[in-house]
C-alpha cells in the first residue's frame, strides 16, 4: 500500500484541480499497484526552501512495503514521477526531488483485528531511504 505525500510551496490556486486523482493513477501504473491501494496527500502553500532557494519547488515522498527496491528500480520510479509532476506543476528540473523509503512490514497495521500480515522474512531493521534528483 503505497503512501505518496506531495509537498509544495506553490499556492493552492497553482496546483491543478484533480491532481491527487491523477497522481494516484500514475502511482498505480508506475509502481505496479492497484489504484485502490494507493494513498495520496497533496499539500500546497507550504513554507519551503530547496537548495537554499524559496523559488517554486515540490518534494514527493513515497513510502511502501515491497515497492522501493533496487537503485535501478528507484531511479526508474523517480524518473517517471519526475516527468509526470514537472509537467503537472510546471516546475524547473532542479526544483523537484523525490524521496523513496521502504516501510518495514512491522510498521503497517493489520487491516482487521487478528489478521496476520503475510510475506517472507520481515524487513525489521532493514528500512532504507533513497533520495534522487533526476
From Swiss-Prot:
It is found in: Cytoplasm. Disulfide bonds: none annotated. May have lyase activity. GO terms for cellular component: cytoplasm; extracellular exosome; extracellular space. This is D-dopachrome decarboxylase-like protein. Keywords: Cytoplasm, Lyase. Gene3D superfamilies: Macrophage Migration Inhibitory Factor (3.30.429.10). Belongs to the MIF family. Its EC number is 4.1.1.-. The keyword Ligase does not apply. GO terms for molecular function: lyase activity; phenylpyruvate tautomerase activity. PANTHER family: D-DOPACHROME DECARBOXYLASE, D-DOPACHROME DECARBOXYLASE-LIKE PROTEIN.
Amino acid at each position: 500500500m503505497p503512501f505518496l505525500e506531495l509537498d509544495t510551496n506553490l499556492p493552492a490556486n497553482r496546483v491543478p484541480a484533480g491532481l491527487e486523482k491523477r497522481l494516484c493513477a500514475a502511482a498505480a501504473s508506475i509502481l505496479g499497484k492497484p489504484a485502490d491501494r494507493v494513498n495520496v496527500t497533496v499539500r500546497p502553500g507550504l513554507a519551503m526552501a530547496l537548495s537554499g532557494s524559496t523559488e517554486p519547488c515540490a518534494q514527493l515522498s513515497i513510502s511502501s512495503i515491497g515497492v522501493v527496491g533496487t537503485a535501478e528500480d528507484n531511479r526508474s520510479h523517480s524518473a517517471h514521477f519526475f516527468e509526470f509532476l514537472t509537467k503537472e506543476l510546471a516546475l524547473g528540473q532542479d526544483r523537484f526531488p523525490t524521496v523513496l523509503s521502504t516501510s518495514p512490514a512491522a510498521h503497517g497495521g493489520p487491516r482487521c483485528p487478528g489478521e496476520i500480515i503475510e510475506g517472507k522474512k520481515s524487513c525489521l531493521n532493514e528500512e532504507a531511504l533513497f533520495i534522487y534528483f533526476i
